[in-house]
């Protein structure tokens, strides 16, 4: 089972079909429009386990969470929902002993009405699972996570995900607060990107105070705000006006020029970030150029998606960008994600692993 943004089930299904085929796991996706989830039915027993072990979760763009389904209950009796789940899981010899329980729903308005029930149900369900030896007596982040996903009252999927190959967040969504002094809500996109793409223990080194960043298409400064908050200096490139609160920090230089033509005068930039409303292929190529020229070491940028053929567009743009870097002998690490705070767009992170002198 995979969670995704409502309206992106088709893209999520296309992606899991492709990835499963690459691992020689065969099946078909069950897709319900605007449901916020996709169920991939494997033809052979044991293949769901094969997928959650062998398919790198971080390589999935449109999935927020991934877990192997052990059972589906379509009509749990309201007077006792716990016993049928315990009975079914006890039959599964391969079901792992779990260290955490998440009782969730897909991210739709209808399903989220069940969240209050999910919270109340968690404590008795956890106690019952521990009593049966299906969960460890103490929470353990190094053990599998047991998921119970309610898609409607009495209708749920039960399964598990593996630590290190799942989303660490409940429902696959990081809980971020909008900072009152940020100039726009887009600030949460970049903050979420840092959480998703950069391991927390590397923040001090890779998002260090005193670094220089460039923000293309910066105004009014939602993304710049995240860099300034981390005590970086920023070249803000936009013909529009920047928020006064950011200008007053003394940490930013505002360049009123076209983002596609800007070149930093001093080549001491670590980060390039970009959230421009432009053709995705054009933005992806521009980011490749910045890394190839050694103008930046890491990039986070958004690609706006077309109305139709979104998955194909994403595959094409990413493939072209990878080929451009490979042909120019640039070593890199690339990850793409349809973030919770993204709408008709995806966010890409590239870390350049080659030591390139700026030119």
From Swiss-Prot:
Cross-referenced InterPro entries = RlmM_FDX, RlmM_THUMP-like, RNA_MeTrfase_FtsJ_dom, rRNA_MeTrfase_M, SAM-dependent_MTases_sf
GO terms of biological process kind = methylation; rRNA processing
- Which GO cellular component does the record give, naming just one? cytoplasm
Concerning Pfam families, the annotation shows:
FtsJ, RlmM_FDX, RLMM_N
Q: Where in the cell is it found?
A: Cytoplasm
Top enzyme class = transferase
Which UniProt keywords are given for this protein, alphabetically ordered? Answer: Cytoplasm, Methyltransferase, rRNA processing, S-adenosyl-L-methionine, Transferase
Major localization class: cytoplasm
- The EC number of this protein is 2.1.1.186
Residues the entry annotates as binding S-adenosyl-L-methionine: 186, 219-222, 238, 258, 275
| Reaction(s) this enzyme catalyzes, per UniProt | cytidine(2498) in 23S rRNA + S-adenosyl-L-methionine = 2'-O-methylcytidine(2498) in 23S rRNA + S-adenosyl-L-homocysteine + H(+)
Look up keyword Hydrolase and say if it applies. Answer: no
Cell cycle keyword on record:
no
What GO MF terms are annotated? S-adenosylmethionine-dependent methyltransferase activity
Active site (catalytic residues): 304
Mind telling me which NCBIfam families this protein's record contains?
Answer: PRK11760.1 (NF008734)
The subunit structure is: Monomer.
Q: What does this protein do?
A: Catalyzes the 2'-O-methylation at nucleotide C2498 in 23S rRNA.
Q: Which family does it belong to?
A: Belongs to the class I-like SAM-binding methyltransferase superfamily. RNA methyltransferase RlmE family. RlmM subfamily.
Put simply, this protein is called Ribosomal RNA large subunit methyltransferase M
Organism listed in the record: Vibrio parahaemolyticus serotype O3:K6 (strain RIMD 2210633)
Its gene name is rlmM
């Amino acid at each position: 089972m995979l969670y995704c943004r409502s309206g992106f089930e088709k893209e999520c299904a296309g992606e899991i079909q492709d990835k499963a085929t690459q691992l020689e796991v065969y099946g078909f996706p069950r897709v319900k429009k605007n449901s916020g989830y996709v169920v991939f039915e494997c033809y052979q027993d044991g293949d769901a386990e094969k997928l959650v072990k062998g398919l790198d979760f971080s390589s999935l763009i449109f999935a927020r969470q991934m877990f192997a389904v052990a059972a589906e209950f379509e009509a749990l009796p309201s007077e006792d929902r716990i016993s049928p789940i315990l009975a079914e899981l006890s039959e599964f010899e391969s079901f792992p002993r779990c260290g955490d329980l998440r009782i969730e729903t897909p991210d739709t308005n209808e399903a989220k009405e069940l969240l209050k029930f999910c919270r109340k149900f968690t404590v008795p369900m956890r106690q019952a699972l521990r009593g049966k030896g299906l969960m460890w007596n103490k929470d353990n982040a190094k053990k599998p996570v047991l998921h119970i996903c309610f898609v409607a009252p009495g209708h749920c999927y039960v399964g598990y995900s593996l630590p290190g190959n799942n989303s660490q967040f409940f429902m696959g969504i990081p809980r971020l607060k909008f900072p009152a002094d940020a100039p726009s809500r887009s600030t949460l996109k970049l903050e979420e990107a840092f959480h998703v793409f950069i391991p927390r223990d590397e923040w001090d080194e890779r998002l260090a105070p005193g670094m220089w960043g460039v923000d293309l298409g910066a105004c009014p400064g939602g993304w710049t705000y995240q860099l300034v908050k981390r005590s970086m200096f920023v070249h803000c490139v936009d013909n529009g006006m920047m928020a006064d609160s950011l200008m007053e920090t003394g940490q930013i230089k505002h360049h009123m020029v076209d983002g596609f033509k800007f070149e930093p005068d001093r080549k001491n930039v670590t980060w390039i970030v970009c959230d421009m409303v432009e053709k995705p292929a054009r933005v992806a190529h521009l980011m490749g150029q910045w890394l190839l020229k050694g103008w930046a070491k890491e990039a986070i940028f958004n690609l706006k998606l077309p109305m139709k053929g979104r998955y194909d567009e994403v595959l094409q743009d990413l493939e072209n960008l990878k080929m451009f870097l490979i042909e120019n002998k640039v070593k890199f690490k690339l990850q793409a994600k349809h973030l919770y705070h993204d709408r008709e767009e995806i966010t890409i992170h590239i870390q350049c692993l080659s030591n390139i002198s700026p030119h």
